[in-house]
Amino acid sequence: MIELSATAYAAELQRFKLRGRVWLASKDIPADVQVPTAWRALLDMRDAALETSLAKMWAGVVDRLPAVRQFFDEKLRRPAVLQKENGDLCLLYPYTVDHDDLNFFIGHPPLGDLVSDDMPLWRALPDDLRSFYQLAHNGWTFFPANSMGPLPIGDQTALTAKLDLTPDETRALGVNPDLVWTVFQNGGGDYLCLDLRDSAGDGSAAGRIWWHDNPAELEPVDFWAVMNAWFEIFVEDADRR
């Protein structure tokens, strides 16, 4: 059975060239490292209280993603704060598979006041997704693939950047690919996107899947339901805590 310690976390991250300092308790964090208050609180929380506290931090979006809430309740191990070599901070969400394979989802600091409704893209995102980016994490994905969760804003692109289509194929998509935004990737080259013409507010009906092996078509889907389903399938083999 794998050891769940700061040393073990750091060693696993280093296997993928991610180096830095890891802390599992807030008392170990140096005074000059400015860690979000909610993250500090998580480090000192009993396992039984983790799900409730994370649900508050993820308010809104966690109700859209019941598989994530179940993951927090049943499979998430002790969270930790990582300070990368460049000084950037992340919140580590560890879990194990077969009790000896340590894995992480990584959450980046929330955007807070760095965004405003004056930004057209920001206004176009679903309300609960905006809340997530602003209050919980600017991206929360499986490491190192940067997949299976909402991508950081800076890693999202218009679908145009993924396409190599003829003009006729582009017209057949039925939507300007500049207005289709990649929000979530499944690690296999496929993207869950938002049609920005209809994504503000609830966002459910604005979901589109772009399959890399069928690049000239977009599949209309329920945005939140697909995100939840893809995540649920991905972590189904994770060990129970």
Predicted regions located by residue number:
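A recognition module on extended beta-rich or small alphabeta surfaces enriched in W/G with H and D/E
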Residues: L173-D178, F184-R241
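A surface-exposed partner-binding patch
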Residues: M1-D190, S199
